[in-house]
From Swiss-Prot:
PROSITE patterns: OMPA_1, OMPA_2
Extracellular side: 25-49, 72-89, 115-139, 163-179
Protein source organism: Klebsiella pneumoniae
GO CC list: cell outer membrane; pore complex
Transmembrane segments: 15-24, 50-59, 63-71, 90-100, 105-114, 140-149, 154-162, 180-188
Disulphide-bridged cysteine pairs: C309-C321
Location of the OmpA-like domain: 208-336
Topology term for the membrane: Multi-pass membrane protein
Sequence repeat feature ranges: 199-200, 201-202, 203-204, 205-206
GO biological processes: monoatomic ion transmembrane transport; symbiont-mediated suppression of host toll-like receptor signaling pathway
Protein name: Outer membrane protein A
CDD domains: OmpA_C-like (cd07185)
Protein keywords: Cell outer membrane, Conjugation, Disulfide bond, Ion transport, Membrane, Porin, Repeat, Signal, Transmembrane, Transmembrane beta strand, Transport
Amino acid sequence: MKAIFVLNAAPKDNTWYAGGKLGWSQYHDTGFYGNGFQNNNGPTRNDQLGAGAFGGYQVNPYLGFEMGYDWLGRMAYKGSVDNGAFKAQGVQLTAKLGYPITDDLDIYTRLGGMVWRADSKGNYASTGVSRSEHDTGVSPVFAGGVEWAVTRDIATRLEYQWVNNIGDAGTVGTRPDNGMLSLGVSYRFGQEDAAPVVAPAPAPAPEVATKHFTLKSDVLFNFNKATLKPEGQQALDQLYTQLSNMDPKDGSAVVLGYTDRIGSEAYNQQLSEKRAQSVVDYLVAKGIPAGKISARGMGESNPVTGNTCDNVKARAALIDCLAPDRRVEIEVKGYKEVVTQPQA
């Protein structure tokens, strides 16, 4: 079966991500008007390269928190007589609110604040004065953009960010705003899919275990008798050991007594029942639970000799020929537990 991955623009809940961005940064309201700074006599280069790095924590598909560093660029005040420069950078903390448009594309906004540092300098040949000052402060940050999941772990974003009132004109001579359009890439940690929970294989059905034992009646009993002989007791002792070793779950045993066809059918039926019961009584006395074993007389049914003795007329010879029909069969049936080895 092939694995199917669904990309999501937002990272998984309760995971971290980190990335960087690069873009076009532009200052607005850039004139010098305070603390001895004065306007230049040439063009002002108010757009520069901006860059940043950020890290975040995704709470759920709609909410995350980000912290980042931004270099907002250096603005040059050009002039052949009077010139100067202004630059700013800062650390920001924002809440990121997102909403999915498709499975792999989100729109989002970020709202928060930036702790910034602003530096300015001026060289004024017209007055023979040079100035250099810096200032720090906090300004609100607003940003909006779209984020696209390239892979499960990698996402890109296109964003426009606005920082209001950077610097104090009374200190650094100006108080510009900054807008930055950037393209960012982030790596999301912990996006691996959890291992699927494999349901354990159902326990195999127990196997039915059946075993047959056949004992010659001539070993167990004297001819035409139902009392066990000493040799018969020894044979049953050996049988008991085998039955004890089997130990099938929910096992039971049926003792079937058979006779030959000599004598009346009714007599043979009665004799087979007595012989079967004698075997049961002996095995119960040895320790087999009485509820687990039963006796059944089968009379002269199911002969194993077939018609092989049909032409035997002498009684003694017929008794010998029909000896295989005189038997006791024990059928043990139960359930055997099937043990499967766990797969590595």
